[in-house]
């Protein structure tokens, strides 16, 4: 059964929610790979203009942070409430994003031992670089669609 959710733009008031959720989900990985959690780093990287809040039953249950860059789109963060892990919401959110941006490169960085890595690989992301316990991954543009748009059948 498909779970219903909606997505709304974030505002400054969502900062604490996003901070707490990210720390809850990622603290162990940050400690294992980078020696600890640095609150100032999260604050420095948080831009509500790039963040969308996932809502279910009128409650925040996660967020997605993406920004355009010179290569296409960069997924800065996707976090869901632990109670939703493994229930298909993250897959659906990412599939919709990939469909909207199918003609662009979509990049992300993840820890090599992050369980979400399997999801990214299943959705077609490939590893382009392995560095200090992290993986740079990319989903290549849909070449068929790109070539049709350019008239190169």
Question: Where are the language model's segments positioned?
Answer:
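Conserved acetyl-CoA-binding loop-helix of GNAT-fold acetyltransferases
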Residues: 86-99, 118, 122
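Short hydrophobic/aromatic beta-strand element in the GNAT-like acyltransferase core
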Residues: 50-53, 63, 77, 107, ...
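Conserved beta-strand in the GNAT
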Residues: 59-67, 74-79
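A glycine-centered beta-loop-beta connector
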Residues: 14, 55-59, 72
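Conserved GNAT-fold acetyl-CoA-binding loop/helix
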Residues: 19-45, 49
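C-terminal "cap" of GNAT-fold acetyltransferases
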Residues: 69, 104-117, 121-153
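A short, internal acetyl-CoA/4′-phosphopantetheine-binding micro-motif in the GNAT/acyltransferase core
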Residues: 78-85, 110
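A short beta-loop-alpha structural element at the N-terminal edge
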Residues: 5-20
């Amino acid at each position: 059964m498909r779970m219903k959710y909606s997505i709304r733009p974030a505002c400054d008031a969502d900062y604490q929610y996003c901070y707490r959720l990210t720390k809850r989900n990622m603290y162990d990985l940050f400690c294992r790979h980078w020696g600890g959690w640095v609150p100032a780093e999260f604050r420095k990287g948080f831009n509500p203009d790039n963040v969308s809040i996932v809502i279910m039953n009128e409650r925040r249950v996660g967020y997605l942070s993406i920004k355009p860059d010179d290569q296409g789109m960069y997924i800065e963060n996707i976090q869901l409430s632990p109670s939703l892990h493994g229930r298909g919401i993250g897959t659906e959110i990412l599939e919709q994003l990939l469909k909207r941006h199918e003609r662009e490169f979509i990049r992300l960085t993840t820890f090599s031992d992050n369980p979400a890595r399997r999801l990214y690989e299943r959705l077609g992301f490939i590893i382009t670089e392995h560095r200090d316990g992290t993986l740079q991954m990319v989903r290549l543009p849909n070449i068929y669609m790109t070539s049709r748009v350019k008239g190169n059948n």
